[in-house]
Amino acid sequence: CDVMRVCTERCFSMSHFITRFADVVKIPEPTVAQVQLNELVSMCKRFMEGMCNDRNIILRLECDPEVGQVRLDASLFEQVLVNIIKNAAESIESAGEAAGKQGEITVRTTAPALIEIVDNGPGISKETEAKLFSPFFSTKPNGQGIGLVFIREVLSRHGCAFSLRTYNDGLTRFRILFN
């Protein structure tokens, strides 16, 4: 009977912990406004450049001048882009010098309204790809599995289509398409 009581208490305790943990990642409703997509992407690139330089990773920006304005919450979207670039940099860094190539991340915009973050890190297996946006799933030793969940929620609330996968050319692409 004590074993059942302990199990029940642990279940309630774990349930309470997960609920509290989930509250930490509550995402506010987007406050949308017309935003120049190229300006937002350029600002994020400048913000993340130092971190990439510190890791000996080249961060490139390729903006299509035909890309115009989109309706989005600039603050939430900045955090999405920062998280994606940070994840790409950490992936490249985890591969280390063994890869024998210069780490590169390219942030690209394409008309009418597409953002693509491309990296030459070690890539994502098909098995991992299927789990990427699941809560608490992480490929990092100390990862908590909430970064991509945050990204998924923000993009969904903005009505964006998105994908993250490694292609046959070995490059990993995070694509965000605005509707």
Where does each model-flagged region fall?
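Core catalytic ATP-binding domain of two-component histidine kinases
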Residues: C1-N179
